[in-house]
């Protein structure tokens, strides 16, 4: 399968509660996309793009980094 070189997050979703998020995946800027992308995997299995500058996203990432759980 051919993957397109473009941003995965065309729009971001607001108002997802932390308790509904199973995991956050952070994609750094690169040739495929000029911006940092944050993709939340919800407990329902859905994926939703979040704004990397959103306070909740920053808090979640800081908590994860301080736990020493890097992935």
Curated annotation (Swiss-Prot):
Belongs to the intercrine alpha (chemokine CxC) family. GO terms for biological process: immune response; inflammatory response. GO terms for cellular component: extracellular space. It comes from the Eukaryota. InterPro entries: Chemokine_b/g/d, Chemokine_CXC, Chemokine_IL8-like_dom, CXC_Chemokine_domain, Interleukin_8-like_sf. It is found in: Secreted. Gene3D superfamilies: 2.40.50.40. Induction: Generated during an inflammatory reaction. SMART domains: SCY. It comes from Oryctolagus cuniculus (Rabbit). Homodimer. The keyword Secreted applies. PANTHER family: GROWTH-REGULATED ALPHA PROTEIN (PTHR12015:SF192), SMALL INDUCIBLE CYTOKINE A (PTHR12015). Has chemotactic activity for neutrophils. Disulfide bonds join 7-33, 9-49. This is Permeability factor 2. GO terms for molecular function: chemokine activity; growth factor activity.
């Amino acid at each position: 399968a051919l993957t397109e070189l473009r941003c995965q997050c065309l729009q971001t979703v607001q108002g997802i509660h932390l308790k509904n998020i199973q995991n956050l995946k952070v994609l750094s800027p690169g040739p495929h996309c000029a911006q940092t992308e944050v993709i939340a995997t919800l407990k329902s299995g859905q994926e939703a793009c979040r704004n990397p500058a959103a306070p909740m996203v920053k808090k979640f990432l800081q908590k994860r980094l301080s736990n020493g759980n890097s992935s």
